[in-house]
Amino acid sequence: MAEPGFFNAMLIGALIFGYVLGSIPFGLILTRLAGLGDVRAIGSGNIGATNVLRTGNKKLAAATLILDALKGTAAALIAAHFGQNAAIAAGFGAFIGHLFPVWIGFKGGKGVATYLGVLIGLAWAGALVFAAAWIVTALLTRYSSPSALVASLIVPIALYSRGNQALAALFAIMTVIVFIKHRANISRLLNGTESKIGAKG
């Protein structure tokens, strides 16, 4: 049986590993490499896929979405070799790293793609629930933010109903953070000024 000190050090290491991986700002890197400048200067000022889509480059937005998700998936799967607790710590670290990346002044994305990536790494069936909820809401509303909020709200409920209380607790915490990061979007939705999916600028 592992000593408590070693176990705690392993969890801290997994958390730091996840954070470093999650803090890579792919949206910013890709838009600069494509000659589109600083994505933080347009739309919501966010570095995530939805804002990259506002540049009009759908392929770049898709690449950002995939890479931001893979950060979470990779962190969870690699750390899973040291047990589920390490995987949970690394996944949460990746999520926090995306939100608050050290490289760009701790001003990152809103975490939705990385949330999904962590979910794929820890409970792939939950990712299917997330995707279905997101797609249905997006088709009904044509807005990205409520789609993300509805999907992230359903996930911990689905996990809890399946008896996975540890993951349900993790994603409940992450869902609260996602809602906090979407405060401005919620305000714009209420005011009728939120941009629809694919809108430029």
Curated annotation (Swiss-Prot):
Pathway: Lipid metabolism; phospholipid metabolism
Cellular compartments per GO CC: plasma membrane
Pfam families: G3P_acyltransf
UniProt cross-references to InterPro entries, sorted A to Z: G3P_acylTferase_PlsY (IPR003811)
Transmembrane intervals: 10-30, 60-80, 86-106, 116-136, 166-186
Annotated catalysed reactions: an acyl phosphate + sn-glycerol 3-phosphate = a 1-acyl-sn-glycero-3-phosphate + phosphate
Compartment(s) where it occurs, according to its Swiss-Prot or TrEMBL record: Cell inner membrane
GO MF entry, a single one: acyl-phosphate glycerol-3-phosphate acyltransferase activity
GO terms, biological process: phospholipid biosynthetic process
E.C. code: 2.3.1.275
Task performed by this protein: Catalyzes the transfer of an acyl group from acyl-phosphate (acyl-PO(4)) to glycerol-3-phosphate (G3P) to form lysophosphatidic acid (LPA). This enzyme utilizes acyl-phosphate as fatty acyl donor, but not acyl-CoA or acyl-ACP.
Subunit field text: Probably interacts with PlsX.
Family from the record: Belongs to the PlsY family.
This protein's name: Glycerol-3-phosphate acyltransferase
Originating organism: Brucella abortus (strain 2308)
Classification of source organism: Bacteria, Pseudomonadati, Pseudomonadota, Alphaproteobacteria, Hyphomicrobiales
